[in-house]
């Protein structure tokens, strides 16, 4: 953010009249930009070190999610810049970022969607990355979800897939449930695309602030056991399911795939300041996304995830250390991998923990589909899907 005292020199390069404040230090615009880019490059370097299997230069193809929000837009711009730097260095290994936006609009409007039009602007401004827009309906072909655990009807071959997903969301009990399941479906679809390409890793553009909000919303939703798996960098288990001839669903395979958050060490307000310093980003990031915290609304019709996001966005200026500590503490927790995984969110099942969460609700039989398939769901997904 702009500093109240512009007469002090930049803490990093000693340039006079540093107009910005970065981690309480006076900073010039160039150093501000370098700081944000350096944080992402550091995380990408750690990722490459974690997953490389040879000392020889290897092709790095990363798939990154794009929501059109500030953080994911900054990630797209920085990946485009990194791809350009690698392209002009003959000795550098190929670097190929694939930026994917999942269009969650399930309306039946014809013509080109607003998301595709906006993505065209991203393509023009960031030509060194590949941009794709995929409809949320593509998730219906994803095998990493046990669809028998969700209230999704069988449908007919010629039925509109969007209509089936609309009925699924209409069957969910609360706003929080719909936001929770939507986030899961988007994550499953991005993982599916990253595996199909194939890519080296899936990159998600969460800031420190967003990860803190995700941490507490996951705990509030009943997935405290799996928070280290869903928030920390590292390998995630992807299970594949198939329906047998007799109608039962069984797991057919599982593999490990890296999911990383390259912007995890940058606060949301720092992203917004970075966007103001980058004309290519300022022109393309929707202003309503950048000013999302300006509107004060009732929490009555908001999901837990939205409430947590607004809370951390409102306190990060005065209590940035607390926000960062939430994320750092989560990163230090053990990533305990279980033998069983939730058929909906894909996180490890903790039988004892689920029992403690459930309290007097009682045990489920764990057989059948729909409400009868509760045994394949973690406690958080049981509550999201069935109330």
Residue spans of the language-model regions?
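Mid-to-C-terminal catalytic subdomains of enzymes
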Residues: 2-23, 30, 211, 266-324, ...
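Catalytic cores of large soluble enzymes that bind and process phosphate-bearing ligands
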Residues: 67, 71, 182, 263, ...
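Catalytic subdomain that performs nucleotidyl-dependent activation
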Residues: 210-213, 217-305
């Amino acid at each position: 953010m702009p500093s109240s005292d512009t007469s002090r020199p930049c803490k990093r390069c000693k340039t006079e009249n540093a107009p910005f404040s970065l981690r309480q230090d006076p900073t010039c615009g160039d150093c501000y930009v370098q700081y944000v880019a350096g944080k992402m490059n550091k995380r990408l370097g750690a990722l490459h070190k974690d997953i490389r299997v040879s000392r020889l230069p290897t092709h790095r193809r990363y798939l990154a999610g794009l929501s059109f929000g500030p953080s994911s837009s900054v990630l797209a711009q920085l990946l485009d810049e990194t791809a350009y730097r690698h392209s002009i260095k003959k000795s550098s290994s190929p670097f190929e970022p694939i930026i994917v936006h999942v269009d969650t609009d399930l309306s039946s409007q014809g013509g080109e969607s607003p998301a595709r039009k906006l993505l065209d602007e991203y393509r023009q401004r960031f030509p060194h990355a590949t941009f794709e827009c995929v409809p949320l309906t593509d998730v219906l072909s994803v095998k990493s979800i046990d669809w028998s655990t969700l209230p999704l009807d069988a449908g007919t071959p010629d039925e509109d897939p969007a209509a089936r997903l609309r009925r699924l969301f209409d069957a969910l009990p609360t706003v929080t449930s719909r936001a929770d399941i939507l986030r899961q479906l988007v994550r499953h679809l991005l993982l599916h695309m990253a595996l199909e390409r194939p890519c080296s890793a899936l990159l998600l553009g969460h800031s420190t602030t967003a990860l803190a909000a995700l941490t507490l919303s996951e705990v509030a939703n009943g997935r405290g056991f799996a928070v280290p798996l869903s928030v920390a960098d590292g390998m995630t288990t992807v299970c594949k399911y198939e329906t047998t001839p007799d109608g039962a669903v069984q797991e057919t395979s599982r593999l490990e795939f890296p999911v990383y958050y390259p912007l995890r060490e940058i606060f949301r307000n720092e992203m917004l300041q970075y966007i103001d310093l980058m004309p290519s980003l300022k022109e393309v990031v929707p202003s309503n996304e950048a000013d999302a915290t300006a509107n004060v609304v009732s929490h009555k019709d908001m999901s837990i995830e939205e409430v947590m996001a607004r809370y951390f966005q409102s306190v990060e200026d005065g209590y940035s250390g607390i926000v960062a500590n939430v994320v750092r503490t989560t990163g230090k927790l053990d990533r305990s991998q279980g033998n069983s995984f939730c058929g909906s969110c894909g996180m490890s099942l903790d039988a004892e923990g689920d029992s403690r969460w459930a309290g007097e609700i009682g045990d489920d039989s764990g057989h059948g589909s729909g409400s009868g398939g509760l045994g394949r769901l973690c406690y958080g997904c049981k509550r999201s899907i069935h109330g």
